[in-house]
């Protein structure tokens, strides 16, 4: 298992193909749905709750796929993509910890949007504070997160929940 403390884009894509933590580990999406370019830091003892943290980034440029369709003459990154990135990172964290199975977003306590990501922005930063992980019959991660654009916080989410399942056929 790869217990590195940072990951580049190629390694994140490898995770999407089951080649980073193993073929049975939770996978990131690939191509357009991968909303992360790099993980700057990941650990299991830092963060606000002392149970782990992740800091990751997405480079912004006007050619990103969503600016061309959301919305015509009013391009803005869909807020749901930033929220999905937070869930992606909770699932990645569980894989990094050694969980096996398929990751699924299970919910979120509260989400607030107080700004927007526009084509002229340079960088989105995701900061997650792990609140709890469960590694029993149920495998689940819970985290609080914020999203910053060019250093300014514009989204927050509490109690992001991701589960890892050996069988999703009845989910």
UniProtKB/Swiss-Prot annotation:
GO terms for biological process: unsaturated fatty acid biosynthetic process. Gene3D superfamilies: Hotdog Thioesterase. InterPro entries: FabA, FabA_FabZ, HotDog_dom_sf. One of its GO terms (molecular function) is trans-2-decenoyl-acyl-carrier-protein isomerase activity. Its main location: cytoplasm. It is found in: Cytoplasm. It comes from Shewanella sp. (strain ANA-3). This is 3-hydroxydecanoyl-[acyl-carrier-protein] dehydratase.
């Amino acid at each position: 298992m790869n217990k590195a403390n940072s990951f580049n884009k190629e390694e994140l894509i490898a995770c999407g193909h089951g080649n980073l933590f193993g073929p049975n580990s939770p996978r990131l999406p690939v191509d357009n749905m991968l909303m992360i370019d790099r993980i700057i830091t990941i650990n299991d003892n830092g963060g606000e709750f002392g149970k782990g943290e992740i800091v990751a980034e997405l480079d912004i440029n006007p050619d990103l796929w969503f600016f061309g369709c959301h919305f015509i003459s009013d391009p803005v990154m869909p807020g749901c993509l930033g929220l999905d990135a937070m869930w992606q990172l909770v699932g990645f964290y569980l894989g990094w910890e050694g969980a096996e199975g398929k990751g699924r977003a299970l919910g979120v306590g509260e989400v607030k949007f107080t700004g927007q990501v526009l084509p002229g922005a340079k960088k989105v930063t995701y900061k997650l504070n792990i609140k709890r992980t469960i590694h029993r019959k149920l495998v689940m991660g819970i985290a609080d997160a914020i999203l910053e654009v060019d250093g300014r916080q514009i989204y927050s989410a509490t109690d992001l929940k991701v589960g890892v399942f050996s069988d999703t056929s009845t989910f």
